[in-house]
């Protein structure tokens, strides 16, 4: 079996709306919004400032980075790296969460750098392994770059696919 925490931890200033379910051994960061009717299975980790649209569900052991926006009705079966939006069925990358990032004081330059990283990951001809190596070697280190790369490296189930690319 799995070694459980024995508790679920919910951060500060979270909003959990009606009929949502958060299962055992989950960890939610601060300022997380869970809209009506969401289901979060056991052992899920959700980063700060993430918003889950209504009737979304996260598969057990899922990892969701910070500043993520999950569209309503999305079934989350893969990990979602920080700063992105996901939507559709099957779930796929839908751009970066630029509105959320601006609301939280990210400069246009920081947002542009995040967009550049995800362009290499999801809109180039490289697969995720090639893109992460390229980003690591060719882009200057920033807090966001390092966080994205660390998240991807530590994702046991793999990350969301790029829209229409079929690449993971």
Give names to the regions the model predicted.
Residues 89-168:
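Terminal amphipathic alpha-helical/low-complexity segments used for targeting or macromolecular assembly
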């Amino acid at each position: 079996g799995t070694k459980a925490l024995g508790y679920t931890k919910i951060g500060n200033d979270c909003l959990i709306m009606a009929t949502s379910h958060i299962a055992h051994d989950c960890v939610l960061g601060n300022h997380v919004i869970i809209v009506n009717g969401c289901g979060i299975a056991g052992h899920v980790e959700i980063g700060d400032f993430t918003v889950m649209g209504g009737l979304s569900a996260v598969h057990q052991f899922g990892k969701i980075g910070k500043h993520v926006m999950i569209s309503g009705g999305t079934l989350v079966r893969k990990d979602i790296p920080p700063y992105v939006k996901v939507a559709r069925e099957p779930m796929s990358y839908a751009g970066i969460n630029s509105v959320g990032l601006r609301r939280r004081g990210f400069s246009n330059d920081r947002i542009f750098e995040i967009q550049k990283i995800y362009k290499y990951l999801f809109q180039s001809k490289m697969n995720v392994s090639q893109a992460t190596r390229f980003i690591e070697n060719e882009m200057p280190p920033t807090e966001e770059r390092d966080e994205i790369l660390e998240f991807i490296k530590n994702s046991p189930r793999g990350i969301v696919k790029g829209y229409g690319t079929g690449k993971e």
